Amino acid sequence: MKTVTEFQNKNILVLGIAKSGYAAATLLQKLGANVIVNDGKPLADNVLAAELQAKGMDVVCGGHPLELLERNISLVVKNPGIPYSNPILVAAKEKEIPIVTEVELAYRISKAPFVGITGSNGKTTTTMLTFEMLKEGQKHPVIAGNIGTVACEVAQDAKENEVVVTELSSFQLMGVESFQPKIAAFLNLFEAHLDYHGTKKEYGLAKANVFKNQTENDYSVINADDADVMELSADTKGQKILFSTTKEIEDGACIKDNALYFKGEKVVEVSDIVLPGQHNLENILAAMSIAKLLGTSNEAITVVLKRFTGVKHRLEYVTTINNRKFYNDSKATNMLATEKALSAFTQPIVLLAGGLDRGNEFDDLIPYFKNVKAIVTFGQTAPKLVRAAEKAGLDIIESVDTLDEAVVKAYAHSKEDDVVLLSPACASWDQFKTFEERGDIFIQAVHKLI
């Protein structure tokens, strides 16, 4: 960890606890700050808050009183999930108190350079691929951010010869000031999180903060097939490394003659890649670009791509039962993700879909039903998905109450060489706490079939 004195004896407000807030508060106390911790949950229900209080911190729970800002606060470190429209953040902004997220702290104390990966879809897969490629290439990566350990915990122990690989959300990137990744990657942009950002433009601008402080000594890895990403990255001062699945890129990454190329050099044959899905080729090109920029060999990259089958809950291969392959894509919480999952297979598909009703219809899925032979729906959106399936002319359409029932029905409708795919196209919160819980229940139900 760098020797950092800027926080000594400063009054710093950590807003929202959870994992990142807890880690930030602990770090700031270690750096000599006077830490005030504030969380909306009552102290009686807040184990982490009680632990911080036991460490001698001033803890205020059960709301976000504006009076906290009267304590000569020099910095607010906010939980990424707390919107900037929250009155205490509005007031802090009016008082010109800097507001950052935990990843900014991590960067300021780290001896190791950062790789920052953002985008609407594919962040986790790309981050894991990058980590695995760098690890295979003996480049000493550590993983942090939305996956792995909280960034400021990792950064404390990171050495100069290591590299911190971080998955970054728009929420985190809104709160950066000096954060300057050596390599920043912007994968794609789709309309999302409008309840937080208001408009797609504001959402995109938050994502583009990943390039904000880069210089000509840094690299900006950019999806050349995404017009929004190209526009948002136009002003980056980093060296642009473009990647594309649709056109040749001489000074970047592309697909040519059934192989992946980087700066004109063949790296790996497409046939060596076991991860399914056209969309995953974009993720692979981005990860490969980062790995090559950090000196990873083609051999190391190929070894990883021959074994990497995906990230849990993201088009994850589960098992094969009587020549039916089961895939868990519980992370598909919107139609776009399900469209990509359906496009990944040429075999007949039995689709399990449904979940929280956010008011949208599912007609956009109809063109992607061409390989779907049967659909089993569940959750709040089941009737809407049934309507879309009927419009698509599917012969086998069923609705059930639970995911366990859906798995049994899906297996009954499948035949040898079919794919049984959970890709809900909806959030999970109508029946499950998280998409991870939904995916785990699917996997358990599949194994009960054996």
From Swiss-Prot:
Amino-acid positions noted as binding ATP in the UniProt annotation, renumbered to this chain: 119-125
The entry's keywords: ATP-binding, Cell cycle, Cell division, Cell shape, Cell wall biogenesis/degradation, Cytoplasm, Ligase, Nucleotide-binding, Peptidoglycan synthesis
Localization terms from the record: Cytoplasm
Give the source's domain of life in one word: Bacteria
- Principal localization reads cytoplasm
Enzymatic reactions: UDP-N-acetyl-alpha-D-muramoyl-L-alanine + D-glutamate + ATP = UDP-N-acetyl-alpha-D-muramoyl-L-alanyl-D-glutamate + ADP + phosphate + H(+)
Would the keyword Nucleotide-binding turn up in this protein's UniProt record?
Answer: yes
Q: In which pathway does it act?
A: Cell wall biogenesis; peptidoglycan biosynthesis
Q: Which GO terms describe its molecular function?
A: ATP binding; UDP-N-acetylmuramoylalanine-D-glutamate ligase activity
Name the record gives this protein? UDP-N-acetylmuramoylalanine--D-glutamate ligase
What is the organism field in this record? Bacillus cereus (strain G9842)
